[in-house]
Each structure stands twice: as structure tokens, then as C-alpha cells.
Amino acid sequence: MRKPTRFSPLLFIFITVFVDLLGYGMVVPLLPFFVQRQQGGATAAGALGSLYALMQLISGPAIGALSDRYGRRPVLLVCLLGTAMAYLMLGLAGSLAAIFLAIMLDGITGGNLTTAYAYIADVTSLDERSRGMGLVGAAFGLGLMAGPALGGLLSANGLSVPAFLACAIALSNVIFGLFVLPESLPVERRTAAPAWRALNSAAQLMDLFRPAPIRWLLVSIFTLNLAFSGLQTNFPLYSQARFGWNTLHNGVFFAYVGTCAVLVQGVLFRWIQPRLGEKRLAVGGLGLLALALAGIALARQDWLMYPVVGLAALGSGVSIPSLTALVSRRVDAGGQGRLMGGSQALLSLTMIIGPALAGVSFEVIGTGAPYWLGSVLAAIALWIAYVALRSRPAIKSPV
């Protein structure tokens, strides 16, 4: 039996998520260049993102249900080990098929954040939960801030170098979790062996929306993620077409975005949440996000990107953890893993749809179209959340 630790479980999960996202941030911006190295084009590079999201859509609910049955720690360790193997395969890949297999494996075992959010729900009280979710968001932002810069620097020595280092980082995370990370879900709170329905993404997505206390909040989260999901892949094209930015400028800008995410979710959110509450932050954050996305669509000078996207980081940084915590409050302890797994599947669904919407609107309508679309979707998410939070009591559901 492992000795109980005197450190906060939140610190452990923060380190786990940060190290995981550090490796992710090192590799993902370089994927188009891995494809180019094998004579692939933009279509193949875009297909990689869709494949990753599709694999997460299939595996997300199963990972959540398995963590409810067997505990968060073993599931998290298996996911991290799968990530390490995927990065190793990517570094060694000598064909497009090998690259696709690596991304497929990474997507299937990409339940790290799903399990991390369930872990947070296990170790925090209802009042502390949104701050715990915000801490995960801060680790996410910090990893994505440092990862792309480190990956870009190392890629000067060859594209495979960042992939191999990301593999080593993921393996170190496995060792950290094996010897240091405590289990968060006691045996008495675990569920029975999951039925086939619990491992089926489509069935679990339908089950996810069935409980009335969380249905409309989940619709709001889905709409919010749909507003965002296509913009990450579209922004470099937008900034190049409108402002003439190159890859270096985009890299600096994404580091700035990561810094904003860390400051908002790691510092500001923890201070402001007890003062304003999750409901106000969810609604207010969605309003700021809708305004910021409209600002991106209207901008004609590149310096405006920094304050406007900073506003978007503020809006998303307070609304996403608040909505996640509000949904989590309405689900009992035995259903947290299924909730987070279903939520990850929901996110993956938007990651399949969103990039296509952004790409088509960008090419057919104009450079600002994806951001107008995102602004409208954020406004719809705001309206749905406002109505749901005004009328729904916090009644717990088993999911």
C-alpha cells in the first residue's frame, strides 16, 4: 500500500496535465510538416485532426466508464502510456500510413483530460470544484504555451527530435503517476463493471442528454465548443491572409494566448469565482467571448489581435470551467467519470464538425466568416445557459 501523501492531490493532477500538454504542444503544431515529409498535402494534414477527434469520440465514453469502475489512476496511466507509444511511432514513421496509425493510437488513448476532470471532481467539494477545473485549464494553457516554442526550437535538429522528447516526457509522466499520484476514487464509490451501452459513444451521448438537470447546460457547452473548435486550425490562415503573418509570428502569438490562459484560469479565476459565482461567470464569459470573436472578424490592424484575443481568453477561461463545474454539481459521485467521458465525446464531435465549418466559410464567404459564425454560436450558447441556469435547480442525476 502506498503511503498517503501530504501534498494536495490538485498539485499532482496539475503536474500530470501540464507535462501531458507540454508533450502535446511540442508535437501537434508540427504535424503538417510530418505529413509534408511524406509528400502529403493540406488535405491529409486536415484529415489527421479529424481522425484524432473521431478516435476520441469513440473512446471517450469508454475511458470515463472504465475510470468509474477501476479508478482514475490506472486508466490515466494507460492513457499516458498510449500517448508515449504514439509519439514514438510518429518519430519513427516512414510513411503517411504510419503517421495515421500513430495519431489513431493517440486519439484512442487520449482520455487524459477526461480522467483528470473526473479526478478533480473526486477530490474537491462542490464549492471548490470550479476552481479545481480552472486549475486544470491553467495547466493546459501553460503546457500549450511552452510546448510549441520548445517543439519549434528542437525541430531545427530534425522533426523526429520533438516527437522523441515528447515520448520521453509522456513516459516520465507514467513513472510520476505510478509512484506519486494517489488514487482519487475509493473502492466503495466505484460502479459495477460497465455495460456495453456505457462503452458505446453514440449510446452514451444519448444518455448524457437524458437527465433534465444537465441537458441544456450540455447543449450550451456543445455550442460553445462548436464556436471555438474550428478556429485553432483556421487562425494561422486568417492571420496570414489578413495581416501577412508567418509561422514565427503565429508561434509568438500562440505563446501569448497560452500565457493569457494561464493568467485567467490559474490566477484570475481562483480570485473572482468566490466573488461572482459560477452562474455569473458562465453567462458573462460567454458574452465576452461573443464580443471578442466579432472583434476578430472586424479587425483590420494586426495589433488589435492581442487585446481582442486576450478578451476571448478571458471569456472562455471563466465560462468553460464554470459550465463544467455546474454540470458536475448536478451529477452524483458514481457518474462523474461517465459524465466527463461523455463530455469528451461531445467535444470530439465538435472537433470533427467545427474545422469543416470554419474552412468552408473561410474559403466561400471570406476571412472573417468563421469568426462571425463563432460569435453567433457563442451568443446562442449564452442564451441557452442563461435560460438553463435561471430555471434548473441543482438536482443530482446518476447520468
What are these regions (language model features)?
Residues 29-43, 233-249:
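Short amphipathic helix-loop junctions that connect adjacent transmembrane helices
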Residues 136-179:
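Helix-loop-helix hairpin linking two adjacent transmembrane segments in secondary transporters
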